[in-house]
């Protein structure tokens, strides 16, 4: 039975108990939320060593880090190190988006390297295998697509992005809608091109019940991908995005009836003032399914700094109901990220998630409160102990030292130091 089916029967599973203990929440509330489909639990039945993670209502906003090879750069050890660094700096999950090299080997190595849930996009493997055989992506058969999905499920992948909402009807609209950027989802584009070439319906939509059967067998969470997401600010909220969203909403309902867990993927580029509306619309269309957003990026003119843009958008999205933030690195739109880029991307997105979590969970706020106390006392040892990135803390302190008990920005002109000394002087008087 899936986590959702057990929850509907009134059973609090071992995974729910573990999550409730980690999150310090009521396990019964978690069970009810999972039963409704408002919260999902990542834990493939074949992924024995994973620490289960919950995403959705009543739990903390989570962070995902994408890693993986490309056709240009295949360095498996580097990708494994990226996964470890991502987890070290706060990623709750990893997605392996590899498109170069031995994809089965890479995926399995990454899964063994970390104990967090791992997600994938199986259509990438189906497409890559076509290219490896000297064929065009559109030559892949429905069987090729399903084999990739089943292989990932059997390997223990906890959640997968499936672009079931890229239907033949929506693709027909693509011909007449004048988009500035077009389609930017790789998986969505592979399927759209396949549909246009063969004139057939998306296999994941046409045979959605078969997908549900597979997902149910392994208790894999279906992350219903936004193949028509906006790839630039001018395309945000257009009819293609909204048409796909409502199709996804209907697919969520069918999955719940089947006892399969689902979440909904959200837009990538959205003007900052439109983010609350986008998130609310996603929640309405999906009857409060967990929302998984990439960013969203709030401005398009800062390549090299898109991790900052995404953190701004992610904080606003999470405050308005987004449950799961996919990180963006400084390399976004420019190239394959390095290990350092991964670290920077995770920390930026972790800031966004924590900024929202501390407004909802007393325990999270207490950490910031303790830091405020330490700063008020100029207690550098305690500040170091609490600091999220201790390496950065030490690096800057060593780089710019001071003889005063304050920092080298103010030294003896430190406001905290002056007020403390004055108050201490008056008290002695």
From Swiss-Prot:
EC number: 4.1.99.17
Pathway: Cofactor biosynthesis; thiamine diphosphate biosynthesis
Enzyme class: lyase
Any Pfam family the entry gives: ThiC_Rad_SAM
InterPro entries assigned: ThiC, ThiC/Bza_core_dom, ThiC/BzaA/B
Note describing how the cofactor binds: Binds 1 [4Fe-4S] cluster per subunit. The cluster is coordinated with 3 cysteines and an exchangeable S-adenosyl-L-methionine.
GO MF annotations in UniProt: 4 iron, 4 sulfur cluster binding; carbon-carbon lyase activity; zinc ion binding
Amino acids binding Zn(2+): 269, 333
GO BP term (any one): thiamine biosynthetic process
Cofactor: [4Fe-4S] cluster
Protein name: Phosphomethylpyrimidine synthase
Gene (name only): thiC
């Amino acid at each position: 039975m899936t986590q959702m089916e057990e929850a509907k029967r009134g059973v609090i599973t071992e995974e729910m108990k573990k999550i409730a203990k980690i999150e310090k929440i009521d396990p019964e509330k978690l069970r009810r939320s999972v039963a409704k489909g408002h919260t999902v639990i990542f834990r493939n039945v074949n992924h024995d060593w994973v620490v289960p993670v919950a995403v959705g209502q009543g739990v903390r906003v989570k962070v995902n880090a994408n890693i993986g090879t490309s056709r240009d750069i295949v360095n498996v050890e580097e990708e494994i190190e990226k996964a470890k660094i991502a987890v070290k700096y706060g990623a709750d999950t990893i997605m392996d988006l590899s498109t170069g090299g031995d994809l089965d080997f890479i995926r399995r190595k990454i899964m063994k390297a970390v104990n967090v849930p791992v997600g994938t996009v199986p259509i990438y493997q189906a497409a890559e295998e076509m290219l490896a055989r000297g064929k065009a992506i559109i030559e892949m058969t429905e069987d090729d697509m399903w084999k990739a999905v089943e292989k990932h499920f059997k390997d223990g992948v906890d959640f997968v992005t499936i672009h079931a909402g890229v239907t033949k009807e929506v693709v027909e609209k693509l011909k007449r809608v004048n988009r500035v950027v077009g389609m930017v989802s790789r998986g969505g584009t592979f399927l759209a091109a396949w549909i246009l070439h063969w004139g057939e319906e998306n296999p994941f939509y046409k045979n959605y019940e078969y997908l549900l059967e597979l997902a149910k067998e392994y208790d894999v969470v279906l992350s219903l991908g936004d193949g028509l997401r906006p790839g630039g600010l001018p395309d945000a909220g257009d009819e293609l995005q909204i048409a796909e969203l409502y199709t996804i909403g209907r697919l969520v309902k069918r999955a719940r009836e089947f006892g399969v867990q689902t979440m909904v993927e959200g837009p990538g580029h959205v003007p900052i003032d439109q983010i609350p509306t986008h998130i609310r619309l996603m929640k309405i269309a999906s009857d409060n399914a967990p929302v998984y957003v990439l960013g969203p990026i709030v401005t398009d003119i800062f390549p090299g700094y898109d991790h900052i843009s995404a953190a701004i958008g992610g904080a606003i999205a999470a405050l308005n109901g987004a449950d799961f933030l996919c990180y963006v690195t400084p390399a976004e739109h420019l190239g394959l990220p390095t290990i350092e880029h991964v670290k920077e991307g995770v920390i930026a997105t972790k800031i966004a998630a924590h900024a929202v979590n501390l407004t909802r969970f007393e325990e999270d706020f207490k950490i910031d409160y303790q830091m405020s106390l330490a700063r008020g006392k100029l207690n550098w040892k305690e500040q170091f102990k609490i600091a999220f990135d201790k390496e950065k803390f030490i690096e800057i302190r060593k780089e710019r030292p001071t003889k005063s008990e304050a920092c080298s920005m103010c030294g003896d002109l430190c406001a905290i130091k002056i007020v403390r000394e004055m108050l201490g002087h008056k008290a002695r008087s």
